[in-house]
Amino acid sequence: RSTYVLWGLSQECLARTLWPLGTFLKSEIRDMAVSYGFEHLAKKSESYDICFIPDNDYRAFLNHRIPGLEKQLEGGSFIYKNNTVGRHRGYPFYTIGQRKGLEIAMGHPVYVTAIDPDQNRVYLGDASDLMDRFLKVRDLNLIKYLQLPDNFTARVKIRYKDPGAMATLHQINQQAEVVFHQPVSAIAPGQSAVFYEGDDLVGGGFIAPLDSKVIKS
């Protein structure tokens, strides 16, 4: 599963990489880096993925990093079936596919299906509204191939814990069109789409937003 975050590596990087670190402690690796003249790397601060945010509270994380953000953006519209159904706390605090924490009573489950940053609008819909078969990938990086074969079939993961779904890929320069064989849920622009052939990591890229400025599934 950890290969999901490695799609951006090149063959040049992989050729110089030793796996795994095994029984070495991180402190020992830092000492090794210093001994080889990479003191600036050894002293770098820890890096954390967003999944390490305390209590998974990205709203508190954003408010801490950008003081006044919520006050600046609160009061935008929740839109459901072209009607305004409530007010939200600011579009950055919501993600495609989100159901919990919306703080709006609709009488039935609703999900974030689209986000319009320019208008500070968050669009809501039913679970079926999240389903789609198509996405585009930008900043394509390939590890296994120099160029994707024609009508290439791969297992595509669109989030870290996603088991993946089969799709047909068509490469266009540094982009790719991905057509899933069955609809998948909550395709979110900005997330990584990662391609596998069996257990082999083929490559990946970032899910591109649609031509519209509205970010949707």
Regions found by a protein language model. Name each.
Residues 1-217:
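Nucleotide-activated chemistry modules centered on ATP-dependent adenylation/adenylyltransferase
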